[in-house]
Amino acid sequence: MDLDIHYPYNIPFYTDVEFISVKFINNEDHIINIFFVKGNTQGNLAALIFPRSERKYQFPKNSIITIITDKKPHKFHCFIKLIDGMTYIYP
């Protein structure tokens, strides 16, 4: 088991779901919040990426997320359909 790999909140690693590997890099000086998207609305919190850091994640296949920053907490920056093996760099 690789200790550098994280899982979204409320999704245990032992769930019988197919996962994909993604990496997030936060180049900002503030935290970015990653939320799941359900329909066209914000769903549950999936992850926090701390300033100037990077994290590897295992997300459920076909996940769609949105990024919201602490500086503009009421604005969706984008909707992203996650692709296996991709690195997502913010900004």
Describe the role of every protein-language-model region:
Residues 1-13, 75-91:
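Extracellular beta-sheet/turn segments enriched in Thr/Pro/Gly and aliphatic residues
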Residues 11, 32, 44-47, 55, ...:
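Beta-strand-rich interaction surfaces with strong enrichment in secreted/lumenal proteins
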Residues 13-14, 18-31, 36:
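Asparagine-centered strand-capping/turn motif at beta-strand->loop junctions
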Residues 40-64:
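Intrinsically disordered, low-complexity Pro/Gly/Ser/Thr-rich segments with frequent PxxP/GP/PP motifs
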Residues 47, 56-58, 68-69, 78-82, ...:
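Short, intrinsically disordered/low-complexity patches at protein termini
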Residues 63-73:
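Short, aromatic- and glycine-rich surface loops/edge beta-strands on solvent-exposed regions
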